């Protein structure tokens, strides 16, 4: 179980069990939007930082997942000062498969600057936690073996690996060194070869995992056994 970020004291788990949860999970949607109670991009980021710090102070492990928007989506607005506003983007934009987004956000692509702006905010979040020696388990581009997200199976394995490696390299160039990177394809997975078919490589990945949603306990157990 994880803390809820929809209130000020993160007390839901404690109210039920008598103790705070050991894992605090947050998504990048909270860094940019209203999930953590922010009323604009700046307050969303600050609330996400504050909640994460408080959870860590209470002994929790902090995790960050990402449901990044399709960076060709019209909900992304460019401000007059040249910055980008992702506040109105939600889960649905991660499922927007149009526009060949992955190709366009890599170096040389027309949306690379937009993607870097998004990563810059993730870097601000991570660096704020690193100042207090708080590590973050970072799970970007999960369920890549499925076809429902723009970074998923419609792209080649080579393109996906390039995206993953570029993301880590860029964040490290921004001074982010407190993240443990997770590779988490969609289960069930029957063989090692199937699991490794899009694996970004040991230089990029610190933790192996998988996503298993709406499957029976048996199928999740089978995938765990294969790993």
Describe each model-derived feature in a short phrase.
Residues 29, 67-69, 141-143, 184-188, ...:
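Active-site beta-loop-alpha junctions enriched in small/polar residues
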Residues 196-215:
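Aromatic- and acid-rich polysaccharide-binding/catalytic face
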């Amino acid at each position: 179980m994880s803390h809820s970020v929809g209130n000020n004291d993160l007390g839901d788990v404690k109210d039920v069990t008598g103790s705070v949860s050991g894992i605090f999970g947050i998504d990048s949607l909270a860094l940019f939007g209203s999930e953590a109670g922010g009323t604009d991009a700046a307050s969303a980021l600050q609330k996400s930082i504050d909640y994460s710090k408080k959870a860590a102070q209470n002994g929790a492990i902090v995790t960050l997942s990402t449901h990044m928007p399709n960076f060709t989506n019209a909900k992304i607005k460019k401000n007059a000062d040249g910055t980008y506003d992702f506040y109105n983007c939600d889960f649905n934009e991660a499922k927007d498969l149009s526009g060949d987004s992955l190709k366009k956000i890599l170096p040389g692509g027309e949306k690379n600057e937009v993607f870097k702006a998004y990563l810059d905010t993730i870097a601000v979040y991570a660096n704020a936690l690193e100042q207090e020696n708080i590590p973050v388990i970072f799970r970007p581009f999960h369920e890549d073996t499925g076809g429902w997200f723009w970074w998923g199976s419609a792209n080649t394995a080579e393109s996906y690996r390039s995206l993953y490696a570029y993301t880590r390299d860029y964040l490290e160039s921004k001074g982010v060194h407190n993240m443990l990177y997770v590779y988490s394809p969609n289960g069930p997975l029957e063989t090692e070869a199937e699991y490794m078919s899009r694996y970004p490589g040991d230089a990029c990945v610190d933790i192996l995992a998988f996503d298993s949603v709406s499957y029976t306990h048996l199928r999740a157990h089978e995938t765990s056994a294969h790993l």
